[in-house]
A protein has these predicted regions:
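Intrinsic disorder/low-complexity segments
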Residues: 3, 8-10, 40, 100, ...
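Conserved beta-strand -> loop -> alpha-helix junction used to position metal-binding or nucleic-acid-contacting
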Residues: 20-26, 31-67
Length: 177
């Protein structure tokens, strides 16, 4: 039987990510700082949008969602900063909780602007990663207790391989290390 390779040894030989997208889970960010020190934090715009919209009445949500898209869809960081300032000016007085929710993560929300524009679509959201795990979780919960450790690993592998067939190609993949 082969001797397992410690995770720290594997990390020494793999390229370190310069940024990782994630939601507001504090454990993820602590682990990121521990395992990949120096990697930028990129907050997921899908999760942040849902969190901000949750703090306002349903009647305001469509207009606010369009204004949030103006921020993360801006062509430059400077334009995004201006759109964010306009958002705070427009909604800050009446919906302070929504404006505070957005501005408290300002740097992490705009971190993707520090990378080539071809990668922005992929860096703004952690949903593609989460959808794979949701598929695996859905199937493994249904078969709870019916699998050995080996067959569970094989099933997870096959689920991820099947899910990978529907993944979108990365834009700017030729710029990856």
């Amino acid at each position: 039987m082969a001797t397992p390779i410690p995770a720290k040894a594997v990390l020494e030989f793999t390229p370190r990510p310069r940024t990782l997208p994630g939601d507001g889970a504090l454990g993820f960010w602590r682990a990121l700082d521990e395992v990949f020190p120096g990697a930028a934090h990129q907050r997921c715009w899908v999760h942040k949008t849902a969190n901000v919209l949750d703090k306002v009445p349903k009647s305001v949500q469509p207009a606010m969602k369009a204004d949030l898209r103006e921020i993360h869809g801006a062509p430059t960081r400077a334009a995004a900063e201006v759109a964010l300032a306009v958002f705070v000016e427009k909604y800050g007085a009446k919906y302070a909780r929504a404006a505070d929710c957005l501005t408290k993560d300002r740097e992490a929300l705009l971190a993707f602007y520090d990378f080539p524009a071809e990668h922005w679509d992929h860096l703004r959201s952690s949903n593609p990663i989460e959808s794979v795990f949701a598929t695996v979780r859905h199937r493994t919960v249904r078969t709870k207790g019916a699998l050995s450790a080996t067959t569970a690993k094989l099933m997870v592998f096959k689920l991820v391989m099947a899910a990978s067939k529907t993944w979108r190609r990365l834009k700017g993949e030729n710029q990856l290390p």
